[in-house]
Amino acid sequence: HRAFFQNYAGGKPLLSCGIKDYHIGALSMIPGLLAGLEATGTTEPSTLLESVLSLVRSTHNHPDSLRAATDLTRLLCALTSGDSIQETISQLSLPGVSIKKLLKWEKLEDRRVVGDTLSTACYLPESFLASLHFAWKYHDDFSAAVLANARVGGDNCHRGVVLGSIVACSHGVPEQWLEGLSALSTMPSLNLCDTVSQDLNRAI
């Protein structure tokens, strides 16, 4: 976040440079952070969540950003149990996420959902809910999910990170999206064990 660097350049302590910002960009580093922690052998539930929240606080220190960060962390970890995305979202009972609305929205054109009902802008919590709409509707098709998200415009980049990580965690990423990545062989997958997933949910 540019404000982080402005504050840091102005002499503020590193951990005090975040601002009260509630944009979905706050969530963009969470999938990579969780994968990195796993790669270093860090799987303690309280450590995972605190690491995520510490990262988000450092740039987007706002209740809506921290709430969405917690929910995304819960969702990504819970998906490792093998349940479908729709089953997992239903079971987690995420605050502000209506399963009834997700069921209704999946029958509508995407622009009626993200554009008319929900804003295409970056502001949380609507942008997180918009990401969940695409992850729910296209739960078994990574390509369809990310392309549908791109087509509605707005802050589709950060929404794409969120919904892409959710669908990829459940079904992986098609080879066509990975071709040409020079460091692919060194990239660990997000594969937290079932026990960690369950413990994290209890901790929250």
Predicted regions and their residues:
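Structured, active/binding-site neighborhoods that engage oxygen-rich ligands
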Residues: H1-I204
